[in-house]
Amino acid sequence: MNMVVIGVTGMPGAGKGVVSRIAESMGFRVIRMGDVIRDEARKRGEDPGVTAVRLREEYGKYVVAEKCVERIQESESEMFLIEGIRSPHEVEIFRKRFPGFRVISVFSTRKTRFRRLRKRQREDDSQRYAEFVERDERELGFGIGDVIATSDYMIVNEGPIWKIKKQAKQILRKLAEKGEESSRGGQEDG
């Protein structure tokens, strides 16, 4: 089997984590770009949003993607899902390093995402709407809108959770099968 590397993108609270959990259940190794940021933020004693900006200022726009590439290359797995792609530069790195790299975007309205984040209560989740909007603006500043707009697959996540799970399984299964076909010399259909 050829290595299968898939990226998932979406604004905070859109449902990337649901797609990642489905991927894990299917045997994918999930690499979370946000974990790279959160780990570094803890070391620095900073807010993860501040760290995300500073890392890119200090080490360049490819820094988080390069750290993910290292994790992939160190692993023995053959199927990977990279959660949390934020910029076209990151997509560029993954496409250069991994032929056949595809991006799945998950979309939810701002209202839906804010409601989910308030329930989730992760350390970097905003409980105030103004902070939530500020985080959205920061994400958009990284170029996430362009990544979403140019993704290979899109899942609209406004309904019950079973719908996103079903769509994610279908897309991931299709991409995993293409990886198997590539290793056997099969043709890709798109």
Curated annotation (Swiss-Prot):
One of its GO terms (molecular function) is ATP binding. ATP binds at residues 10-17. InterPro entries: NTP_hydrolase-rel, P-loop_NTPase. The keyword Glycoprotein does not apply. Keywords: ATP-binding, Nucleotide-binding. PANTHER family: DEPHOSPHO-COA KINASE, UPF0200 PROTEIN MJ1399. Belongs to the UPF0200 family. This is UPF0200 protein MTH_434. It comes from Methanothermobacter thermautotrophicus (strain ATCC 29096 / DSM 1053 / JCM 10044 / NBRC 100330 / Delta H).
